[in-house]
Swiss-Prot record:
Domain of life, per lineage: Eukaryota
Biological process annotations from GO: DNA biosynthetic process; DNA synthesis involved in DNA repair; DNA-templated DNA replication
Native organism taxonomy: Eukaryota, Metazoa, Chordata, Craniata, Vertebrata
Organism: Bos taurus
Protein name per UniProt: DNA polymerase delta subunit 4
UniProt motif PCNA-interaction protein motif (PIP box): location: 1-16
Amino acid sequence: MGRKRLITDSYPVVKRREGSAGHSKGELAPDLGEEPLPLSVDEEELELLRQFDLAWQYGPCTGITRLQRWHRAEQMGLKPPPEVHQVLQSHPGDPRFQCSLWHFYPL
């Protein structure tokens, strides 16, 4: 009785050489020295609203607008951030600002 066959026996053994520049898997890519672009005012405000959507302490956000959620949290004494209210008041008709992060996902 011979050696027990393994599934890897059917695949050829491939030995890899290091690249011409001597790169190996453990090395990081060189730093290009580029910094990320600063966010625009709208992008900063949208990020603030996304963080508000993800903050569970103000209650669920599905099925209502961000402004409705902010008012509900205020009525319940949960002290929602006033910056969120200011952003929502400054963009009254824009669905990007008024609708929650989950608005475009079906319930």
